[in-house]
Amino acid sequence: GHSDTEVLLHAFAEWGAGCVAMCNGIFAFAVWQVQAGTLFLARDRCGVKPLFSAHAEQNLIFGSEIQALLAHPAVPPPVEANGRDKVLFLGPGRTPGCGVFQNVRELLPGQYALYEADTGRLTLHTYWRLEDHDHPDDFAATVRRVRDLVTDAIERQLVSDVPVATFLSGGLDSSLI
């Protein structure tokens, strides 16, 4: 079988940074490009999977949790001047992009970054942004459209090379299914 990671690596080899626009799902990943000396970092459109980074001693330290960065001896733990307020809101309420600690930053939802090892430059790119559109449909058409979108999302999640199971909690999303 082909794991998601293997498919993602092949997609990156084929399309480069353009592969993230084709991804459907939640992800945060990095690809080291040996010949170019660059590190590619990407985060899913809604930011479900976090991705933090810090410049330290001419290197870029990155991980899915701030604790991973702080475990590195080159990443100091001092909190930013306004970070104390944010420590109380480490959930969805905190400021997007802020890593709370000095020199720790979070890649925003729908962004990818390219780190050049020889210059230490980190360039951020937005590949997706939620857009606002007029909604001219009536109630019945809206119900049909939402039903189609939910069915499509469920069918996409059922594609797997391993057995699939589900946990229905009784919340809004579970009740919808």
Label every model-predicted segment:
Residues G1-I177:
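Cysteine-centered catalytic environments shared across enzyme families
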